[in-house]
Structures are given as C-alpha cells and as structure tokens.
Amino acid sequence: MMEGLLWILLSVIIASVHGSRLKTPALPIQPEREPMISKGLSGCSFGGRFYSLEDTWHPDLGEPFGVMHCVMCHCEPQRSRRGKVFGKVSCRNMKQDCPDPTCDDPVLLPGHCCKTCPKGDSGRKEVESLFDFFQEKDDDLHKSYNDRSYISSEDTSTRDSTTTDFVALLTGVTDSWLPSSSGVARARFTLSRTSLTFSITFQRINRPSLIAFLDTDGNTAFEFRVPQADNDMICGIWKNVPKPHMRQLEAEQLHVSMTTADNRKEELQGRIIKHRALFAETFSAILTSDEVHSGMGGIAMLTLSDTENNLHFILIMQGLVPPGSSKVPVRVKLQYRQHLLREIRANITADDSDFAEVLADLNSRELFWLSRGQLQISVQTEGQTLRHISGFISGRRSCDTLQSVLSSGAALTAGQTGGVGSAVFTLHPNGSLDYQLLVAGLSSAVLSVSIEMKPRRRNKRSVLYELSAVFTDQRAAGSCGRVEARHTHMLLQNELFINIATALQPDGELRGQIRLLPYNGLDARRNELPVPLAGVLVSPPVRTGAAGHAWVSVDPQCHLHYEIIVNGLSKSEDASISAHLHGLAEIGEMDDSSTNHKRLLTGFYGQQAQGVLKDISVELLRHLNEGTAYLQVSTKMNPRGEIRGRIHVPNHCESPAPRAEFLEEPEFEDLLFTREPTELRKDTHTHVHSCFFEGEQHTHGSQWTPQYNTCFTCTCQKKTVICDPVMCPTLSCTHTVQPEDQCCPICEEKKESKETAAVEKVEENPEGCYFEGDQKMHAPGTTWHPFVPPFGYIKCAVCTCKGSTGEVHCEKVTCPPLTCSRPIRRNPSDCCKECPPEETPPLEDEEMMQADGTRLCKFGKNYYQNSEHWHPSVPLVGEMKCITCWCDHGVTKCQRKQCPLLSCRNPIRTEGKCCPECIEDFMEKEEMAKMAEKKKSWRH
C-alpha cells in the first residue's frame, strides 16, 4: 500500500489507480477503509481515498512514513474532448515557500511543514490547539461507527445554519429539439454539507424518468433515475456534490432538467435559485396554461401573517412575457369556482417577471376555501396577445416528514413513566390531515388524543382538535378532516403539539411537538412507521421522561440505515459534558447474554442521529429479519440503556456485506511494515477505532484468539487487525512431540518425566497458568514467548508455567556467542544477533528474479541484498533518515525510529532530529549551548 502511494506520488498524475490485488495473504486480515465512491462522480482517487474536484490534502503514505506535511496535493478539474469532467492529481513541495523565521532558534512543530519561533504567539497557539482539540472531538461525534452520520441542531427550527434552501421553476424548453411542453414543475432543494436533497412536484406532464443537473456549460453534472410511482411527487438526493458545482449552485448558475420516457419525450428545465420566501412559505401553487406546447408556467409561494389574516405571496413566472418586451400589464386574480374574489393589477418585464403582493384581511369564507385547497390564483396579460396561467393553492408539499415523539417528560405536568408515543402525519392538498399513532408503557387507559397549541397560560391546555383515536394493539390511525388555514400554517411552522390524556393523567401523560423532519434521501420514512423507543422496553425497565422513535432499513447491499429521533434524554449534572455528549445509540439482539453481536451506532447530541452501519454479522442480520433485535439509546445517567425498541427489518442477506475491492500496485506486493509502537497509544474514544473481524466487534487495544487458527493471537489497533502467529521457543531436546491441543511442540523426555512424577506432584495446579498478555491458559511446565500488545510476541524473553503454584515466571533469553566480527540483527524483533551470510557478487536484473538462493528485495527501482539496510527516498521529499528499511529474505520491512513518550503538552521537532522533544528541554539545551559558547569565547 505504502509503496503504491510512493509510485502514485512519483507519477503525480492520477485519475484512478489500477493494478492487481496482493497475492493470497497468509492471514485473512484487511484494515477497514473508506467505501469506494460511485463511478458516476467526478474527482480523484488517491491511495484508496476519493477526493472531490479542487480538494487539497497532504498525502498519507501509511506506516511508517505517515503524512507528508510538506507536500500538498490538489485534485484539478480537467475536461476531455467529449466535454466530460474528470480529476487529475498534482502534488508539489511547499517547503520552498516557507517564510524565513524572524528568530534565531526556530522550531518545527508536529504536523507543520515550516519552522516557527517558539515564543511570541504561544498564547494564541495554545488557544488554537485547544479549539482544534474540541473541534476534533466534536467531529468524532459526527462520524458513524462504520461509515457516516450527522446530527441535527437542538434548535426547534427544522433548518440549521448549515443548510441552504433553493427553488426552481421548470417549464417547457423552447429551444430544444423536443417539442415544447405545457407541463410545469416546482423543485425545492436543501443543501446540507455536501448533499443536496430535492422534492419535485409537477402538473400537465407524465411522470418523468430522469432528473439531470446541468452546469454552466450545459454539461450533465449529475443524473437521478426516477423510480416508478403513481403520484406527482419525486424525492431524491445528490450526494457528495463537488466543490465547483457547489459554488455554481451558490451563484445560481446550475440548472435542473426533467424528461419523460414516453412517446411524447417532453422536457422541462429551469434555473436553481435562492429565494427569501422559502423560509416562511406554508402554502404553494403551480400555475399552468391550457395551451398545448405553451412553454409557460409559474409557481406561487404564500404564507399567512402570524397575527392577522393577511396572505403574502410571491409569483415566479416563465414564458408569460415575450423576450425583449418592456413593461407588460398583468392581472393577478384570486378566484373560487370562477368567481372573482380579489384582483391586483401590475406591470412586469421579461427580465423581472417576479411579482410580490399582500392580500389583506381574508374573511372567514376565503380562509375556509384556502384550507380546502379550493382557492385559485391566476395571472393574465393584457393587450393584443392574451396569455393566462392559473393554479390551486394548497398547503406546501414536500418530501419532509411530519412526525412527533411523545414523552412523559414533555407533558404539561412532567413525569418519568418510561412511556412513549410515536406519531406520523400526512397533510393532503384538500386540507385533511391523516395520522398514525403508536404508544407503549401507558399507565392507564387512553381518554383522548388531541392536537393543541402552546398553552397561553401555565398548564392551561389550548385544544384545537380531538382525534377519534381507537387503539388496537397500541396502534391508532385516522383523519382530521377540517384543519383550518391558520392551523395548517402553524402545523408547517412546527407550532402545534399532540397530547395523550389517560385515566390517571387526565391533563396529559404523553406530549410531543409536531415537527417537520427534513428529507434525507432515505425512503424508509415514506413507506414505514418508526419503531417506538421507551424506557419500559429496556431490560430492566427504566422510569424516564425520555422517549424516541427510529426508522431502520437494510438496503440490497446489506447495509443498515438508521435514523433516530429522541425527546427529553436525561442529562448529567456536568452541563459541559451533557451539552456535548447527549447519548450513545447501539443495536443488538434481544438476548442480553449475546453481547458479541451488540454494535455501537454513534454518539450524538441534540435530538437526531442518523447513519449507515456496514459489515453486519450474519447473526445480527438474522435477528433483524426475525424481529428479535433491538435498538437502544444510552446516556451517562443510564449507561445500560435509557430507551429501547424492538426492531423487525425483513431482509434476504445470507452473508456479511461485501467489502469494497481495492486495487494495489502489483510491483510492491512483498512489502511488509512494522508498526511504530508510539503511535499505538490508548485512544479515549475506543469505539471510533474498533475493529470488525470474523463477524465480531473488538475494541481498540483488545486481543483475542481468532477462529480460523487458534495458534494466532490478534489485536485491534485503530481499526486495523494485526494477527501474529504464536512463536514457539527453541527446544534443547532431540525428540519432540506435537500435542493436539497445543500450538508448540514439547520435549518427549519431558512428557515421560511428567508421567513418572505424577504421583509426587499431587498438589500441582491442574488448570495451569493464566498469562495476561495473550489471555490464555498454559499447561504446567510449558514455555512460551510472552505476547505484549501492541508489540506482539517478544523473542527476548521466555515464560514458564510453574505448575505447583500456577505462577508465570519470565526471564531474558541468553544469546549464544558468535564467531564473526560484524554480527547483524536479521529482524528488529529478533533478540539475538547472527553472523551474516557470505557476500556474493551483485547479480543482473534478470538473474535477480531467477536466483535460487536468498531472494533480494526490490524497493522502487532499486534492488537490495538480504540483510541490507537503507533509508528510503520519497519523491518531492527526499531521503527519510528517520526511517530505516531492510531486506529480510526477499521481503522489505521498514520501521520509523522509536521515540520515547513525552510528558509535555507542546512537543517540538528540530531539523536533523528524528524525535520530538519538549520545548522546555529544547530551550534549556539552547541556553546551555549558548553559555558554553560564551565560556569558550572568554577563554580565548
């Protein structure tokens, strides 16, 4: 892997890495890596990682070389002859651009390329390092266990500061080879980090088959295949939007196109823009024309005033005014069944066809018709050429989910019952509101279910609608058919609540806010009800005021997608901790004894967490399929679970999810690396660096015996599994035997002596000795090399099990005397030196590959003799004197110089030295050197 990266860095130009995989490895070990990116995305592949266009990074050459901080790589966008955009990697050495330090004794800080002065900005640097530390911990919470996850804000608004909303009006393309269409579509987009979700509704056109995003040159940036359905709503997501396209999106330079696959081959297109009305919009309309192939259309975004019955609206129109026309008078009408209710006159132009106005003081009849979707808004031009578009106003439609988590802690009289309520709503264009409700852990029978406003007085309920909820098996469903326009507006602004009153709690035992959950690209929400999460479902039950629900699904690749919404999780007394780490979500089997299949999903704060879990064991997939799995959220107050729910996800996964194939350079397939012990320090977030191996999860730093071969010992080191074969000590006897239940042979004489002396050793410990290093039992009298993680087996020591006491006695190995003048250590892990073999004259390249003797090593373009040592050279960096490589019978091994652990917080690295040192020690040495220099000058 590392030499493959060296080869890539040498070539400097990469679009994708091709080659062959390593030859069949001796052990089934693979470190977890990032998933391969879709082939449809433009970018660069570098060392198994995908980078978007115009991304910059420091290349990581792996152990023991690490990150090249003085080398900057850039994914440059290129265009082929056919106009297709692809990525090309270029790397340059930045060390030549370093400014000259202003001090006499500059230092090189870890992770930096340029030297800096140790004094001056120390205070600011310390603050920045603290900020980086907390930012890193914050970022860790945003990472899912295997792949990815993000957390929503705790704010009650559905959109946080990291999201941006856009809108597009799509009309028939008049300059296309396809016939112009009379269809109109409205698309709403939300950009969150690097993902763009979209909700599209359309009229007067058959369901499209393809959605395409077009860049400034008219080239396709992304395509979305529309799934078949019998409705007029399209939901989709564009993941990993490249940075150039994100800039074009922010600059309102991207277009969106939709085409049908039927015989008519219609196409609609429009520009994606930002608009100030999107934030407050609660009603909308699509305006179409009765003409055939008109290419005209419009959309209306409307909202009610918070206190008065004023209807604010903005019209966006296309094709109504001929190009190049000056001011054109239009009439904007509000109608009910062809009866004119209101009319506004205005002038618009082809360049600025947007129109904004307020319809003041709507009466009760107009508000009633508005709530039923029966009000029609129309725009008509005046003059010789009359053009007309119109559409009905209804509650704003999108792919977002109206939902609510009901908890006892959110009730007007807060409690801790451990109960839960989970509600999902659907608002129809005619104003009716469907609901589905699940409950668990109620203390008594349900008296009423109601939709309410926020209490105007303390503990004084403000009931709007009583829902006729009849519960069957703790489920209820129904419809509220007369939702007023004002309440529809409040519903879409997250201002309404749902309340469940019981016999013992007549004012309400469970309560929750009805919130719009933004669409995230998963269809589980649109097709399934969430799983309730409650304290009463934890084993043993927990009396808590918290509750939650979750959507869980398994895709065709056997990856588990989850989304969790919680309400009222308990917080610890330490506000600083509870503000950052709110909960831990995990998934497992209903049988608490089956801890091997419990998986941590993510740590999160706020009210929402979502992500993807890969590499699921067959056993856990089977439990998901049979409905015997659970999802649990734990907190600091309840570390063994505060809320839990039983999940049932039917799937047809008969084997673990396949790993992504990664291609390696075939030229470097014999390279082996020895890990640097100083980089294997204990990590406080062990779940982030844990390993998945043979269907089981292992925490960072743990060791175990693998199932495929009990004569190996495996350890987990920062998401990488390292398995070492058991090292057997050298026996001094001539005849050995191999016991079936042991990995190492023993002396046959020792076995016979044991049998004859069995009567004398009646008090011998029958179980043997337990050694903490390899966590194994060793038979009485056996010897072995100790296993010390993360270093592996130590050849310089031999341990013996004292059978009479059960104690382990370890002593250093005595090395034999050598006759040669220049002995060598064949392997850094070997305890004793050996005499090197006699040197042979160098061979030609052809002979090197065909020699029958000891294999030589090829590193880059150079060949090295067995036992030969050298410092590797890296392109753009030069010789790396802190790393030593050696040839071990045809296998190249490299190791960085081992550095002592430092106790200071701010270590520095000086030029010419491989190990960092404390700045205090450095300054002290500098002062002593200066004093010595002064004394020298005094003597002269």
Curated annotation (Swiss-Prot):
Gene3D superfamilies: 6.20.200.20. It is found in: Secreted. Residues 42-118, 689-748, 767-836, 855-919 form the VWFC domain. Cleaved by tolloid proteases; cleavage participates in dorsoventral patterning during early development. The keyword Lipid biosynthesis does not apply. Its main location: secreted. Residues 162-277, 279-398, 404-519, 525-652 form the CHRD domain. GO terms for cellular component: extracellular space. One of its GO terms (biological process) is specification of animal organ position. Keywords: Developmental protein, Glycoprotein, Repeat, Secreted, Signal. InterPro entries: Chordin (IPR016353), Chordin-like_regulators (IPR052278), CHRD (IPR010895), VWF_dom (IPR001007). Residues 1-19 form the signal peptide. One of its GO terms (molecular function) is BMP binding. Glycans are attached at N347, N430. The keyword Lipid biosynthesis does not apply. Interacts with twsg1 and/or bmp4. Belongs to the chordin family. Dorsalizing factor. Key developmental protein that dorsalizes early vertebrate embryonic tissues by binding to ventralizing TGF-beta family bone morphogenetic proteins (BMPs) and sequestering them in latent complexes. PANTHER family: CHORDIN. This is Chordin. It comes from Danio rerio. The gene is chd.
